């Protein structure tokens, strides 16, 4: 059963390889999500054209918060370039991307890997451990969750709950 779950997780992750999630962009009536992604690309110095985007839409959420945008790129290379440049958004205001948004809106824009549900759960648990000061760093690369317990150079890949449990001991 465990192998079946692992195979399902790997297959789901493979289907999300070209995807990123963009959080923090408020919904506007008549919005053009492809244009928003292109503007974000300009802001982070990544040349994105409409031909680079396979599909872009908002995800449904159970809570009434701003729905994230999911982008599927046509090439893995463009997805990686966009994802790796995400740190350039740290000082960007939403009004710099969407002119119709008031300047008072100070929320940040985040770009994340689009993770399979199981890996998203592992990421949430790892982040809780980081907040509890049990881990120094938590991040994802290509849908895989990595952590550092100390500042040592070698990260630990987290595939299952017991990987995190072993780090806690």
Language model features: what each stretch is:
Residues 1-169:
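C-terminal folded interaction/catalytic domains of modular proteins
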């Amino acid at each position: 059963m465990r192998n079946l779950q692992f195979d399902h997780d790997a297959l789901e992750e493979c289907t999300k390889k070209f995807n990123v999630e963009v959080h923090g962009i408020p919904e506007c009536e008549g919005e053009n999500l492809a244009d928003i992604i292109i503007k974000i690309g300009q802001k982070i110095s990544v040349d994105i054209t409409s031909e680079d985007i396979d599909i872009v839409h908002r995800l449904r959420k159970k809570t009434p918060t701003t729905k994230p945008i999911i982008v599927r790129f046509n090439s893995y290379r463009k997805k990686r370039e966009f994802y790796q440049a995400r740190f350039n958004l740290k000082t960007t205001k939403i009004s710099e991307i969407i002119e119709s948004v008031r300047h008072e809106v100070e929320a940040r824009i985040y770009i994340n890997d689009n993770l399979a549900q199981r890996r998203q759960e592992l990421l949430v648990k790892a982040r809780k451990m980081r907040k509890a000061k049990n881990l120094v760093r938590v991040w994802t690369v290509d849908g895989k969750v990595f952590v550092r317990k100390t500042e040592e150079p070698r990260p630990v890949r987290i595939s299952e709950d017991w990987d995190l449990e072993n780090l806690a001991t």
